[in-house]
Structures are given as structure tokens and as C-alpha cells.
């Protein structure tokens, strides 16, 4: 499982049926790979909930998202598992099939909520417009395999 965390001043995701937005917090781009499990979702959710990615008065990254009353916008993104080794068109066979991936994606979002976080989401498996106003920028990539951070 791969999650790209971007610290944002604001972010939104829209399509024909959806309009979710947050102010200060994280925009998460969530990739579910063939071998991704609920254990991977748990360890990444814990890391994100406790990550100190917001500055204190001395410009040190000392505050986590709860300490700054931030929110999360979680967007599924199977393209994080693109295979670009051959040719010019990426392959996506490393992504988990959608029926299984959606379950892990929803489990991951619920795991974040279990830490008391406000989590808004995109719509799994649809084309969306994602607007991200990066803050910093601060971008961290979390990856887990077999329930362990890589």
C-alpha cells in the first residue's frame, strides 16, 4: 500500500455527484497494490495520525494533524502502482482489483477516523477533479508491505 501525504492549506475533490473540501490538513493519494492488506492500512493510518508535519513557533515540524485541528481529504489513486518499465503507456496490473481495493480503501479511511480524525473522501473508481493547495510544500510518501512500513 502506498499513500502520498501532502500538507495543504485547502483541498477539494469534485465530480458530477461529489463536492468534498477541506481547509488545513492533509490530502492523501491512496494506492492499493496487489499485496495490500488491512494490516498495511492500519500501520499507515497510525503513522499518518501521529506524524508531526506542522510547524511550531520555531519552524520545527512538531505538531500532528490533531494538534492543529486539521482535516483529511482521502482520494483513491490506483495509478500509484503504475508499471512504467516497458513502453510508453503505463500498466496497472500491480494495482489490486477494484472490488478488493475499495474494501481496503474504506477500511483505511475508517482506521484514520478511529484516531478521531475528520476524513472526507473522493469517490472510489471514478474520474475526479482534485484541487490541492500545497503548504510548504510538505509531501511524504508512506509505503507498507506485510503490515510493516517500508
Swiss-Prot record:
InterPro entries with a match to the protein in the record: Daa-tRNA_deacyls_DTD (IPR003732), DTD-like_sf (IPR023509)
Gene3D superfamilies (UniProt xref): D-tyrosyl-tRNA(Tyr) deacylase
Catalytic activity: glycyl-tRNA(Ala) + H2O = tRNA(Ala) + glycine + H(+); a D-aminoacyl-tRNA + H2O = a tRNA + a D-alpha-amino acid + H(+)
Keyword presence, Cytoplasm: yes
Gene Ontology cellular-component annotations: cytoplasm
Enzyme type, top EC level: hydrolase
Transmembrane annotation, as ranges: none
Cystine connections: none
GO MF term set: D-tyrosyl-tRNA(Tyr) deacylase activity; Gly-tRNA(Ala) deacylase activity; Ser(Gly)-tRNA(Ala) hydrolase activity; tRNA binding
Superkingdom of this protein's organism: Bacteria
GO biological process, one term: D-amino acid catabolic process
Record keywords: Cytoplasm, Hydrolase, RNA-binding, tRNA-binding
Compartments it resides in: Cytoplasm
Motif (Gly-cisPro motif, important for rejection of L-amino acids): 136-137
Its EC number(s): 3.1.1.96
Pfam family, one: Tyr_Deacylase
UniProt family annotation: Belongs to the DTD family.
Record's function text: An aminoacyl-tRNA editing enzyme that deacylates mischarged D-aminoacyl-tRNAs. Also deacylates mischarged glycyl-tRNA(Ala), protecting cells against glycine mischarging by AlaRS. Acts via tRNA-based rather than protein-based catalysis; rejects L-amino acids rather than detecting D-amino acids in the active site. By recycling D-aminoacyl-tRNA to D-amino acids and free tRNA molecules, this enzyme counteracts the toxicity associated with the formation of D-aminoacyl-tRNA entities in vivo and helps enforce protein L-homochirality.
Comment block on domains: A Gly-cisPro motif from one monomer fits into the active site of the other monomer to allow specific chiral rejection of L-amino acids.
Subunit-structure text: Homodimer.
Protein name in the entry: D-aminoacyl-tRNA deacylase
Organism: Staphylococcus aureus (strain bovine RF122 / ET3-1)
Name of the gene this protein is made from: dtd
Amino acid at each position: 500500500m502506498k499513500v502520498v501525504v501532502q500538507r495543504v492549506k485547502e483541498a477539494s475533490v469534485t465530480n458530477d455527484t461529489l463536492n468534498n473540501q477541506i481547509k488545513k490538513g492533509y490530502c492523501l493519494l491512496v494506492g492499493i497494490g496487489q499485496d495490500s492488506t488491512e494490516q498495511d492500512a492500519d500501520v499507515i493510518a497510525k503513522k499518518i495520525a501521529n506524524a508531526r508535519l506542522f510547524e511550531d513557533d520555531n519552524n520545527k515540524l512538531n505538531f500532528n494533524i490533531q494538534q492543529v485541528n486539521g482535516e483529511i481529504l482521502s482520494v483513491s489513486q490506483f495509478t500509484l502502482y503504475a508499471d512504467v518499465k516497458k513502453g510508453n503507456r503505463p500498466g496497472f496490473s500491480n494495482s489490486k482489483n477494484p472490488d478488493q481495493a475499495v474494501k481496503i480503501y474504506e477500511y483505511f479511511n475508517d482506521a484514520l477516523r478511529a484516531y478521531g480524525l475528520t476524513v472526507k473522501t473522493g469517490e472510489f473508481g471514478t474520474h475526479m477533479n482534485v484541487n490541492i493547495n500545497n503548504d510548504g510544500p510538505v509531501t511524504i510518501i508512506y509505503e507498507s508491505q506485510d503490515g510493516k512500513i517500508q
